[in-house]
C-alpha cells in the first residue's frame, strides 16, 4: 500500500466528507504530485473504498511517479446525485443505480454513452435485497409475502434519498409483478408493506443503524452487503434471509466529464474508474459483501453468496427512465402510496 510520511501528509483529508460546492482542485499542485480527485459514492460503499483507494494510489504512483490525493464523500445515492448537480465537484461518481447517472447526464455533467466507456456497461458491483431479522426470526419472515402479514414492522430507507431504497421498492414490486401477478396486485402488496414502515431513514447505512442500534422494526430490507457486514461485525445474531425471488442491484461508476475537464485530471479519473473493474478491486468488493462483476472473481466466490432462483433487473421494468417516471417522479406511484400511508 502507498504509505510514508509525505503521502500521509498529502492525504491527511482523504476519506473525509467534502462539502457541497467545494472545489478541491483549485490552485496549483507541487512537482511530483498529481491533481487530486473527488470520489462521490453511496453510503454503504465506504468500507470497500477505504481498502481499494490506497491500492489504486500505490499503482498510480508506480506508473506515473506522482502522488495522487483522493477525497471521498458518502451518502444516500439520490442525495449525492442532487449534490453533484448543485455543485459538489465530483470527478468520479460511483452511485447506487444507473438512474442517478442519467440525472447527471440530463444535467449536462456526464456525456451520453457513458455506459460504453467502461467494462460491463460501467457496472462495478452487483447485489440483491436481504432481510435482516431479530434473533431467532420470531416473525418467521422468509419471503416477500411475509412482509405484509399482520404484526410485522418493516424498516427500509427513503426512496426519495436512497438508491438502495429504490431497489427495495423494485424488489417488493417485482416479487409480485415478475412472478405472475398483475401490476394492480403489485401495487396493493407494496402499499400494504409500506403501511408497516414507521420511519424512512435517509440512506441504507442509517437504515441499518435504525434496525440494529436503535432496535426499531421486526425486519430490515437492505443490501445483501450490509447484512454480510453486520454479520461479520457480530451485530446480527440470526442469519439473514435472501429471498429466492430477487432483484439484481447494479451499481455503476461514471466520470463526471464537465468537472474533470475543468479540473484537468481526466487521466487519473479514467484510471480510477477502470481500476474498479479490475480483479484486485473486485476481490475487495467481494470481501466487503458485494457480488463481483468480474467473471473469474465471481466464479471463485459464488459459493459464499446465497443462491437466487428468480432474478429480475431494472431492464425488466423498462430501464431507469421508465422506472423513475412510473414510480418515483412527482405524483407517481411512490407519492401516491406515501399519501395513502399518511
Task: Label the predicted regions.
Residues 14-17, 260-342:
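Extracellular/periplasmic juxtamembrane helices and adjacent flexible linkers that interface
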Residues 136-142, 161, 174-182, 259-269:
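Short helix-loop capping/hinge motifs at secondary-structure junctions, enriched
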Residues 1-7:
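Sec-dependent N-terminal signal peptides
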Residues 179-245, 252:
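Ligand-binding pocket segment of bilobal, Venus flytrap-like solute-binding proteins
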Residues 54-62, 85-89, 98, 105-109, ...:
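Sec-exported extracytoplasmic/periplasmic mature domains
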Residues 9-13:
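C-terminal motif of bacterial Sec signal peptides marking the signal peptidase cleavage site
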Residues 17-161, 303, 342:
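N-terminal segment of the mature folded domain
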Amino acid at each position: 500500500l502507498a504509505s510514508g510520511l509525505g503521502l500521509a501528509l498529502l492525504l491527511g483529508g482523504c476519506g473525509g466528507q467534502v462539502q457541497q460546492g467545494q472545489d478541491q482542485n483549485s490552485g496549483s499542485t507541487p512537482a511530483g504530485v498529481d491533481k487530486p480527485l473527488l470520489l462521490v459514492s453511496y453510503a454503504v460503499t465506504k468500507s470497500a473504498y477505504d481498502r481499494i483507494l490506497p491500492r489504486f494510489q500505490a499503482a498510480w504512483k508506480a506508473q506515473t511517479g506522482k502522488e495522487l490525493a483522493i477525497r471521498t464523500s458518502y451518502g444516500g445515492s439520490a442525495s449525492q446525485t442532487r449534490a453533484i448537480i448543485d455543485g459538489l465537484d465530483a470527478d468520479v461518481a460511483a452511485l447506487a443505480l444507473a438512474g442517478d447517472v442519467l440525472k447527471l447526464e440530463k444535467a449536462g455533467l456526464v456525456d451520453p454513452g457513458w455506459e460504453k466507456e467502461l467494462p460491463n456497461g460501467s457496472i462495478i458491483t452487483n447485489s440483491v435485497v436481504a432481510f435482516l431479522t431479530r434473533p431467532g426470526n420470531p416473525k418467521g419472515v422468509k419471503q416477500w409475502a411475509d412482509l405484509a402479514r399482520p404484526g410485522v414492522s418493516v424498516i427500509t430507507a427513503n426512496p426519495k434519498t436512497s438508491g438502495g431504497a429504490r431497489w427495495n421498492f423494485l424488489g417488493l414490486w417485482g416479487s409480485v409483478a415478475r412472478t405472475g401477478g398483475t401490476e394492480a396486485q403489485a401495487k396493493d402488496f407494496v402499499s400494504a408493506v409500506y403501511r408497516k414502515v414507521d420511519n424512512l431513514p435517509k440512506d441504507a447505512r442509517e437504515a441499518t443503524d435504525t434496525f440494529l442500534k436503535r432496535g426499531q422494526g421486526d425486519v430490515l430490507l437492505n443490501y445483501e452487503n450490509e447484512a454480510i457486514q453486520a454479520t461479520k461485525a457480530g451485530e446480527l445474531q440470526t442469519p439473514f434471509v435472501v429471498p429466492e425471488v430477487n432483484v439484481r442491484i447494479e451499481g455503476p461508476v461514471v466520470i463526471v466529464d464537465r468537472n474533470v475537464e475543468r479540473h484537468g485530471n481526466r487521466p487519473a479519473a479514467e484510471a480510477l474508474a477502470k481500476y474498479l473493474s479490475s480483479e484486485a478491486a473486485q476481490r475487495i468488493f467481494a470481501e466487503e459483501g458485494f457480488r463481483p462483476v468480474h467473471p473469474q472473481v465471481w466464479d471463485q466466490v459464488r459459493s459464499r453468496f446465497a443462491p437466487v432462483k428468480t432474478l429480475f433487473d431494472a431492464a425488466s421494468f423498462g430501464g431507469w427512465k421508465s422506472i423513475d417516471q412510473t414510480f418515483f417522479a412527482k405524483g407517481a406511484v411512490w407519492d401516491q402510496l406515501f399519501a395513502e400511508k399518511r
